[in-house]
From Swiss-Prot:
InterPro entries assigned: DHquinase_II, DHquinase_II_CS, DHquinase_II_sf
GO molecular function list: 3-dehydroquinate dehydratase activity
Annotated site residue numbers, Transition state stabilizer: 27
Natural source organism: Ralstonia nicotianae (strain ATCC BAA-1114 / GMI1000)
Known pathway: Metabolic intermediate biosynthesis; chorismate biosynthesis; chorismate from D-erythrose 4-phosphate and phosphoenolpyruvate: step 3/7
Keyword set includes Amino-acid biosynthesis: yes
Name of the protein: 3-dehydroquinate dehydratase 1
SUPFAM superfamilies referenced in this protein's UniProt entry, alphabetically: Type II 3-dehydroquinate dehydratase
Enzyme class: lyase
GO process annotations (BP): amino acid biosynthetic process; aromatic amino acid family biosynthetic process; chorismate biosynthetic process; quinate catabolic process
Family from the record: Belongs to the type-II 3-dehydroquinase family.
Pfam families for this protein: DHquinase_II (PF01220)
């Protein structure tokens, strides 16, 4: 079965990191690994550059700031979003509504396998509207999302 084409080529990708991801590398490394957020962003930037894709990234511990950044993405011509909503995955109708409101396709990413964790982490308010969900691959899940975007929807 062929993937549903997305009208716009993915020349511009926004990566959104939710709450507490600024603590990566030191926060519960047995769950989230030792890789820092700066390391993840650098790996993504290198992969994006090699693929001819413009990449921006943003992290916030505040739901409203993430909503504002999603809304701004529309006027910036962002073609695709990679989002790790972190704890907001399980609570935020606001993020879901913002993503629906801008109608930019997105992939949801989680470092850990949320389905092997506490039951409250099994539900996502974003997953049913996402192009895909990647979880449990550690920081490499972000690269998998970017690789999918480039391979299926075009680079620069």
């Amino acid at each position: 079965m062929a993937d549903k084409p997305i009208a716009k080529a993915a020349h511009s990708v926004l990566v959104l990191h939710g709450p507490n991801l600024n603590l990566l590398g030191t926060r519960e490394p047995e769950i989230y690994g030792a890789t820092t957020l700066a390391d993840i962003n650098a790996a993504l930037a290198e992969r994006a550059s090699a693929s001819g894709v413009s990449l921006a990234h943003f992290q916030s511990n505040h739901e409203g700031a993430l909503v504002d950044r999603i809304q701004a993405a529309k006027s910036e011509g962002i073609a695709f979003i990679i989002i790790n909503p972190a704890a907001y995955t399980h609570t935020s109708v606001a993020l879901r509504d913002a993503l629906a409101g801008v109608a930019i396709p997105y992939i949801e990413v989680h470092l850990s396998n949320v389905h092997r964790r506490e039951p409250f982490r099994h539900h996502s308010y974003l997953a049913d509207q996402a192009v895909g969900v990647i979880c449990g691959l550690g920081w490499r899940g972000y690269l998998a999302a970017l690789d999918y975007i480039v391979s299926q929807h075009g680079g620069g």
